[in-house]
Regions:
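Residue patterns forming the tRNA-binding/recognition surfaces of aminoacyl-tRNA synthetases
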Residues: 1-46, 66-67, 108-110, 119, ...
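Phosphate-backbone binding and catalysis cores of DNA-processing enzymes
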Residues: 9-10, 51-55
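Protease-associated
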Residues: 50, 57-63, 67-140, 149-153
Length: 322
């Protein structure tokens, strides 16, 4: 959906505090510690590929006491400013801070996925991200490149690919060990249970917050990284031509010129594909086996001729052989 087609309504989400055990690090004082994250989307844990931190934030190693189910005498790591809030939300009081350090010490640190014994036995690197703040959570962000723009861009920068987490129906794909075949909105309870069984769950609860919904269907929305079709703004000088066209156009009111000009000056490549059942579809046939599009100019020209004569409804109603 386009941004203009998204509206925000109150929604109740499950929340979790869960840990990723450090497996490799350059800093001796970080060894054998557990990095704690907070998320309102437990269903994205199987899509996790990294943890994001802020090099300017101060973090603390907290030695836990005996009033938690899975973390007795273990060391956890959270942002220093958020210790009080996390301890209250996770209901533990028996702890002591044994060391405070700057976030840049996380460089070259690698963690294990909490589901490492369920088929998720890959490295989870810690990466610096300037989007990490102290507004909520633990100061360390669970990063799933398939399900968020910040996540995607940070992982892309470090060569981590987005996994094919789910299909078009919102069901975990075969690439997701243990949970494949489950609808993502029905998976939270399973994820929470397994995190507890893996002794990685520090706490969980619920949160009412503003959440994106489709303005047409009113259904809740999720971010999902998929292959799309783009028109480059740089090739064939499209951006330059568009800016010149704006300058050559008379605007009423005149202030509209600056608004659209600033939009074109900074916009990324133009995504022209959509996944929806209204509007004009792109005339593309895609192989069911390889998922590759049929790149045949003659066929595309034939479809264009049909559109000109009959409109686009035929794409949905006519025989594909036509």
């Amino acid at each position: 959906l386009a941004d203009a087609e998204v509206e925000y309504k109150d929604h109740i989400s499950n929340t979790i505090y869960t840990s990723f055990e450090i497996k490799k690090t350059d800093k001796d004082f970080l060894k054998k510690s557990h990095v704690v994250i907070w998320t309102t989307t437990p269903w994205t844990i199987p899509a996790n590929r990294a943890l994001a931190y802020n090099g300017k934030i101060k973090y603390s190693i907290v030695q836990m006491g005996k009033d938690t189910q899975h973390f007795k005498n273990k060391n956890i790591i959270i942002a220093s400013e958020l210790i009080k809030r996390v301890s209250e939300e996770c209901n533990f009081k028996d702890f002591k801070i044994i060391k405070e350090f700057n976030g840049n010490n996380f460089k070259n640190t690698v963690c294990s996925h909490p589901f490492k014994n369920l088929g998720y036995d890959y490295d989870v690197p810690m990466l610096e991200g300037d989007f990490v703040t102290l507004a909520q959570g633990t100061g360390i962000v669970h990063t799933a490149p398939s399900h968020g723009p910040d996540d995607f861009n940070l992982c892309l920068k470090h060569g981590l690919k987005a996994s094919n987490t789910m299909n078009d129906a919102g069901i975990y794909s075969d690439e997701i060990p243990f949970f494949s075949g489950t609808h993502i909105f029905k998976a939270d309870s399973q994820i929470i249970q397994k995190l507890s069984e893996c002794k990685s769950l520090l706490g969980n609860g619920k949160l009412q917050h503003s959440f994106p919904h489709s303005w047409r269907s009113k259904a809740p929305l999720v971010y999902r990284a998929t292959s799309q079709w783009f028109i480059s703004m740089e090739k064939k000088n499209l951006r330059k031509k568009a800016l010149k066209a704006i300058d050559d156009t008379v605007f009423y009111p005149e202030k509209g010129r600056d608004r659209i000009r600033s939009m074109i000056e900074t916009r990324p490549d133009w995504c022209i594909s959509r996944q929806r059942i209204w509007g004009v579809p792109l005339p593309l046939f895609v192989s069911k086996k390889t998922k590759e599009p049929l790149k045949d100019p003659e066929i595309i020209e034939n479809i264009a001729r049909i559109y000109e004569k009959e409109g686009s409804d035929g794409w949905f109603t006519d025989d594909p052989q036509k």
